[in-house]
Each structure stands twice: as C-alpha cells, then as structure tokens.
Amino acid sequence: MDTVVDARGLACPLPAVEARRALAGVPPGAALVVLATDPEAPIDVAAVAADAGWSFAAERNAAGWRLTLRRPELGRPAPV
C-alpha cells in the first residue's frame, strides 16, 4: 500500500520536508506519493528521492503534481 503525503498548498521546501519525514515509514518495494501544488516541488522532491536512492516520477494533473518516490526492494538497487 502506498503512503500518501498531502502537501497541496504548501510552499517549497515544505513538500520535500514532509516527504523526507515520511520516508522511514515506507516498506521496501512500496511507494511514497506526494501531492503538491508548488511548481518547484518536483525539483525538491526529486532531490529527496535521489538522496535516499529511490526512484522518482512526476505527473502533472489538474490538481497540481503527483510525485511518486519508490523504495527499492530489499537487495535490489533503485532503477536509474
């Protein structure tokens, strides 16, 4: 099950701060989804994913951004 952080309405760097706080609670192979409206959020949250060694994908929609950080499975590196 994915963990969702609703950071809509928060200005950067707060979406990235909230994402970093949530990392520890995500099990291997699962995803952390950050919902954000700040246009800089994809850049900051991508840096959080890179620092953690997790994969990252950003999707723009009518409500803002859906940013997905996926924790690697145990014993597997994150996809590049």
PLM features: residue spans?
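Right-handed parallel beta-helix/beta-solenoid
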Residues: 1-6
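Amphipathic, hydrophobic secondary-structure cores in small proteins
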Residues: 7-59
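C-terminal structural segments of small proteins and small subunits
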Residues: 46-80
